[in-house]
Amino acid sequence: MNDVIIRQLAHLIPYQPLWEAMQTFTARRQSQTTDEIWFLEHEPVFTQGLAGKPEHVLNSGNIPLIRTDRGGQVTYHGPGQLMMYLLLDLNRLGLSTRTFVRTIENTVAESLQEWGIPAQGKETAPGVYVDDKKICSIGLRVRKGFSYHGLALNVAMDLTPFSCINPCGFKGLMMTQIQDYVNPIEMDAVKRTIIPLFLKNFGYNQPAIMVETSLEFLIDDHLRSFSEKLGERETVTNSRQN
């Protein structure tokens, strides 16, 4: 069994600095670094993966479009969507990239089935689906056996922005969310369902769970640039003086 830290960020996070924080964490981690999973919701943003093609962005409008270094094509992130960023040591977990993706899909599907939603993965396309509608997108990057990026699970959100793109590069792909099957639904309830399944399926001990109501945990050297980019430079300075 391996240790893991779960961080739950309690406010909407802009994409760019969060992405840079993941890159920095991954570049500086070592074999003894504890794995981390970050739970959060993003401010509205389209992200274009490494395989992304411009023709799949139909009309981004006023929503920012950021080209990122995860796998896959274009998708949307926004409030009401649960992001799980998986900063894991795949070598330590004994997982190939393919098995890693399948374990994510199976875990998400298992959690949705607990809500009575008949979700499952597809052999032909990463992610989790209910019938032919996509409810969870997966986009990852693995460097030297360390993963970052993760999954986006649609919980209770405005799905309209997905109509401005071909989600994940598939023209006409319909998106769905937990709220379409279980209403009302609370984000915290979804987390309470999915966390134990991730721990079980990935072989983790009971985690240290950090509820981050501020960005003070980002004072650590490997995340200081993230803190500053989010306008927390003054908070960091004050924390060091106290």
Swiss-Prot record:
<feature type="site" description="Lowers pKa of active site Cys">
    <location>
        <position position="134"/>
    </location>
</feature>
<dbReference type="InterPro" id="IPR000544">
    <property type="entry name" value="Octanoyltransferase"/>
</dbReference>
<dbReference type="GO" id="GO:0036211">
    <property type="term" value="P:protein modification process"/>
</dbReference>
<dbReference type="InterPro" id="IPR020605">
    <property type="entry name" value="Octanoyltransferase_CS"/>
</dbReference>
<dbReference type="InterPro" id="IPR045864">
    <property type="entry name" value="aa-tRNA-synth_II/BPL/LPL"/>
</dbReference>
<keyword id="KW-0808">Transferase</keyword>
<feature type="binding site">
    <location>
        <begin position="137"/>
        <end position="139"/>
    </location>
    <ligand>
        <name>substrate</name>
    </ligand>
</feature>
<dbReference type="Pfam" id="PF21948">
    <property type="entry name" value="LplA-B_cat"/>
</dbReference>
<dbReference type="GO" id="GO:0005737">
    <property type="term" value="C:cytoplasm"/>
</dbReference>
<comment type="pathway">
    <text>Protein modification; protein lipoylation via endogenous pathway; protein N(6)-(lipoyl)lysine from octanoyl-[acyl-carrier-protein]: step 1/2.</text>
</comment>
<dbReference type="GO" id="GO:0033819">
    <property type="term" value="F:lipoyl(octanoyl) transferase activity"/>
</dbReference>
<comment type="function">
    <text>Catalyzes the transfer of endogenously produced octanoic acid from octanoyl-acyl-carrier-protein onto the lipoyl domains of lipoate-dependent enzymes. Lipoyl-ACP can also act as a substrate although octanoyl-ACP is likely to be the physiological substrate.</text>
</comment>
<feature type="domain" description="BPL/LPL catalytic">
    <location>
        <begin position="31"/>
        <end position="206"/>
    </location>
</feature>
<keyword id="KW-0963">Cytoplasm</keyword>
<feature type="binding site">
    <location>
        <begin position="150"/>
        <end position="152"/>
    </location>
    <ligand>
        <name>substrate</name>
    </ligand>
</feature>
<feature type="binding site">
    <location>
        <begin position="70"/>
        <end position="77"/>
    </location>
    <ligand>
        <name>substrate</name>
    </ligand>
</feature>
<comment type="similarity">
    <text>Belongs to the LipB family.</text>
</comment>
<dbReference type="InterPro" id="IPR004143">
    <property type="entry name" value="BPL_LPL_catalytic"/>
</dbReference>
<protein>
    <recommendedName>
        <fullName>Octanoyltransferase</fullName>
        <ecNumber>2.3.1.181</ecNumber>
    </recommendedName>
</protein>
<keyword id="KW-0012">Acyltransferase</keyword>
<feature type="active site" description="Acyl-thioester intermediate">
    <location>
        <position position="168"/>
    </location>
</feature>
